[in-house]
Structures are given as structure tokens and as C-alpha cells.
Amino acid sequence: MPEGLQVFNDGGFVQIDANYLNMELKNRGSGVIPPSNMAAGGAQSSSITFTVNGENPAIAVISERMAACYLVSRRGSSFTFAIYNGENANNSVEWFQFDNSNNDGAGDSGLQVFNGVGRLVFDSNKKYLRVLDYWERGTGNLETRGYPGKRVAVIMCDYGYRFVVQNSPVDPSSPNYKFLQSQLDCARTTNDSLSIELTATWTNAFAPYHGEQNVVEGPSRWLVVDVTNF
């Protein structure tokens, strides 16, 4: 085998050698997001924003209620993200920033692996991205997966959305007004499980609209990561 270290687990092994590449934990934070009432047609959409520095940050989120994390803006190496609260209740969230690993050691003891040009590719003192699962789903009802013994967070890789046009309950026979609703796949984590469900982000029960009833939708894509003891 190539020079390096093989780590065996129940799923096989990981080869740590000069070609090893992973993202490491760079930063973390937490917050409480006020309630949103968009599903009921209200005007309150609540989120928190935070800014991190990096090269290619990936944000993993733990959320006690349905939430979605997305990039708001980038200016050079500064990235601003938002976490949207998809429920009409306070939402406690944690976030973890993973990014490209650098050449700095993280301690005075442990195992370090360097490549042929002297770059540090693994340090046992660092916390690296640990992917448990990749989840791609078409928009639909609530789905839940369990990961026993793990504390899980989720990285939203691609939006899952649905835009619904239906006859208005205010006047079902009107050709000029419709019920409109936009929906977004949001995620909730509970210790060792992850749930994903479509959550309404905007509703108008009597909106000026001259089209037919219709549904436009796209799938969502997620990485489930293990943040146990992080």
C-alpha cells in the first residue's frame, strides 16, 4: 500500500497518506432565532446571520426546529450565511464551519502525516469533517433517518422547493385570483436523528394571478455529518 496509516472501522478503512484531503473544523457558534409565521400568511420571516472567514466554507447546522442555512454574500475571503427559522416558535441552533485544512499543527503531541512537499495533511489533534450520509430527496412529506450513537448536523447542499398555485379558498371560482404558496425543504436535528420536511416560506390566499393551477418543484440535497464530541 502507499506509505501512510490505515484506520479500520465497521465500514472498512480510511487510508491516510500523502494524498489524504479533508476539511477541518474552523469555527462554531450558536443562537436563538425568533419565530416565523410565514406559513400562516404572516409577514414575519426570522433568521440569524453570521460571518466567517475562509476559502471554501461548508456550514453544518444543528437545529431543534425546522431550519435552512444558505449563503447570503461573499466579499473576498469573508462569507455571510443566514439560518432561517421555518417554524412559529423560538429556534435554538448551533453551526459548525468546516473549511480547507491548513498547514498549521494543532498540538505538541499526537500523530501528524505530511506529504512529499512537507505539507501537513493530517493531524490527530484536529477535528475533521465526518460524513455519515448523503440524502437526496424529492419534495414531499416529513422524512426521518436515525444515526444511533451519533450527534448529527446537516449541510444543505441544494435547495428543495415547491411553488403551489391553487384555486383561492376566498373565491374558488375566480379566474384572476389564486392561492399561492412557496415552500422550502427544511431540516431538524434531534441528537441522533434528522428530519426533513417542506415548510411554507410565503403564503397569499387571495393573490392576483391569471395562470392555471400548478406545482413547480425541485429536489433537495443534504450531507449528514457526525459532530459527536465537537
Residue ranges of predicted features:
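Low-complexity "stalk/linker" and mucin-like segments enriched in Ser/Thr/Pro/Ala/Gly
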Residues: M66-G76
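Short, solvent-exposed coil/turn segments at beta-strand boundaries
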Residues: P2, G54-E55, D192
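A generic structural motif
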Residues: S78-Y84, L194-L198
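Short, hydrophobic/aromatic-rich segments at coil-to-beta transitions
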Residues: P34-S36, E55-A58, G76-A82
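Long, low-complexity, charged/polar intrinsically disordered accessory regions
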Residues: P175, L180-S193, L198-T201
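Extracellular receptor-binding modules and their adjoining Ser/Thr/Gly/Asp/Asn-rich linkers
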Residues: M1-S47, N85-S174, T199-F230
